[in-house]
Amino acid sequence: GCCSLPPCAANNPDYC
């Protein structure tokens, strides 16, 4: 998922 991918997690702090 997004939160396991560092760039995605970094871009979605509220979600992750």
UniProtKB/Swiss-Prot annotation:
Query: What residues does the record give for site: Important for inhibitory potency on alpha-3-beta-2/CHRNA3-CHRNB2 and alpha-7/CHRNA7 nAChR?
Result: N11
Q: Where is this site: Important for inhibitory potency on alpha-3-beta-2/CHRNA3-CHRNB2 nAChR?
A: A10
What keywords are assigned to this protein?
Acetylcholine receptor inhibiting toxin, Amidation, Disulfide bond, Ion channel impairing toxin, Neurotoxin, Postsynaptic neurotoxin, Secreted, Sulfation, Toxin
Spans annotated as Ser-Xaa-Pro motif, crucial for potent interaction with nAChR = 4-6
Which positions form S-S bridges? C2-C8, C3-C16
User: Where's it mainly located?
Assistant: secreted
Protein location = Secreted
The protein's name is: Alpha-conotoxin PnIA
